[in-house]
């Protein structure tokens, strides 16, 4: 069953059931899916490799495979644009394992119901315990660790910090995506947040 952080609306969950196996067969994981309606309809898919480091070519491969599957299944009534992107540096946290993977980094979390008079929490992730997400909060100058049931969460994402940027770049360097010169230059310039996107027509975009 797809959780509400990956796919919030009923149509998103239906689409997730269709595209998740396609993405998995290519060796990737679905991070988030949203069908956005307005003047035009856009299907936004966020995917990643199990160990991170998804690139433009990966987005293109996912876009082509998903597009072919959706053409057959035809779950979307209106004409739409398909956008496939990486999660970006200040990525959403949609799976329980994400909170364990990014332990030690700052995050913002929202819950569906009020907890001790609040729904929004910001602090350092402290891993997981069973089905609970642990987060360190600053309360009157003291650090307090609380546990939030994963099923209570309505939204969660990393906060963009220098430490997070450097860690993501180190991972990309270790994966061979960045060479030594690129790594040093990017760290000094402190890049803006964003994710490479591959639209259905094959054009590249930058999401902010």
Swiss-Prot record:
Keyword Cytoplasm recorded = yes
Against InterPro entries, the record matches this protein to:
Ribosome_maturation_RimP, RimP_C, RimP_C_sf, RimP_N, RimP_N_sf
> Keywords of this protein's UniProt record, alphabetized?
Cytoplasm, Ribosome biogenesis
Q: Where is this region: Disordered?
A: 189-208
User: CDD domains annotated for this entry?
Assistant: YlxS_C
Query: Which BP terms in the Gene Ontology apply to this protein?
Result: ribosomal small subunit assembly; translation
Q: Which domain of life is it from?
A: Bacteria
Intrachain S-S bonds: none
- Cytoplasm: present as a keyword of the record? yes
Q: Where is this gene product found?
A: Cytoplasm
Task: Choose one Gene Ontology CC annotation of this protein and give it.
Answer: cytosol
The record, for Gene3D superfamilies, names: Ribosome maturation factor RimP, C-terminal domain, RimP-like superfamily, N-terminal
Describe the function of this protein: Required for maturation of 30S ribosomal subunits.
* Family stated for the protein in its record: Belongs to the RimP family.
Instruction: Output this protein's name.
Output: Ribosome maturation factor RimP
What organism does this protein naturally occur in?
Ruegeria pomeroyi (strain ATCC 700808 / DSM 15171 / DSS-3) (Silicibacter pomeroyi)
């Amino acid at each position: 069953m797809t959780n509400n952080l990956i796919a919030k609306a009923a149509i998103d969950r239906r689409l997730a059931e269709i595209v998740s196996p396609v993405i998995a067969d290519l060796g990737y994981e679905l991070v988030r899916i949203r069908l956005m309606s307005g003047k035009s309809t856009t299907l936004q898919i966020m995917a990643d490799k199990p160990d991170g480091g998804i690139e433009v070519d990966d987005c293109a491969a996912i876009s082509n495979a998903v597009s072919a599957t959706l053409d057959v299944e035809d779950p979307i009534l209106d004409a739409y644009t398909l956008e496939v992107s990486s999660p970006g540096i200040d990525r959403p946290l949609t799976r329980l394992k994400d909170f364990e993977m990014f332990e030690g980094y700052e995050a913002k979390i929202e819950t569906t119901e009020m907890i001790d008079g609040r729904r929004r929490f910001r602090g350092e992730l402290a891993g997981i315990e069973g089905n609970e997400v642990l987060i360190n909060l600053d309360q009157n100058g003291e650090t307090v660790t609380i546990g939030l049931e994963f099923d209570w969460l309505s939204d969660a994402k990393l906060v963009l910090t220098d430490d997070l940027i450097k860690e993501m770049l180190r991972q990309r360097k270790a994966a061979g995506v960045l060479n030594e010169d690129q790594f040093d230059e990017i760290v000094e310039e402190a890049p803006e947040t964003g994710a490479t996107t591959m639209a259905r027509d094959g054009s590249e975009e930058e999401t902010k």
